[in-house]
């Protein structure tokens, strides 16, 4: 193969790879916006005023054993204990740190009524690590969510 032809193939291959990477980034492959789930619920991560938040959109068990809608019974504010868990905005304030990480947010745990500092980090296009912590991130818990089918960023 002639050396100039080899260089042309290398340049064409490089440009094709660069174009595919650019298209992948532009289509939201690195965006957490959309639907996510864990073993208990489905969540929607959304953008509001340039920051990310999340709300509960479905529960595996939406009612109590008595058949009543689950409410925020552990909230430290008694006036909020009757609000439904379904639709609850429980994460807020996340700012983008990198293409895969959002920080400086908070996460509210309706099972305990506690609010924690939090960050999110994408682990590929279909997994996100959500870490809630007190003080420093070494003291906390990480939950892994998977992107819900059809929940891609559009």
Predicted regions located by residue number:
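Central antiparallel beta-sheet cores of small beta-barrel/beta-sandwich binding domains
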Residues: 32-33, 38-117
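Edge beta-strand at a domain terminus
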Residues: 134-154
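Bacterial N-terminal signal peptides
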Residues: 10-22
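Residue-level recognition of beta-strand termini and adjacent short loop/turns
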Residues: 98, 124-126
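N-terminal secretory signal peptides that target proteins for export/translocation
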Residues: 1-5
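N-terminal helix-cap/turn-to-beta initiation motif at the start of protein domains
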Residues: 23-35
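A mature extracytoplasmic/lumenal domain signature
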Residues: 47-49, 56-58, 109, 122-124, ...
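Short beta-turn/strand-loop junction motif enriched in small, turn-promoting residues
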Residues: 41-42, 133-135
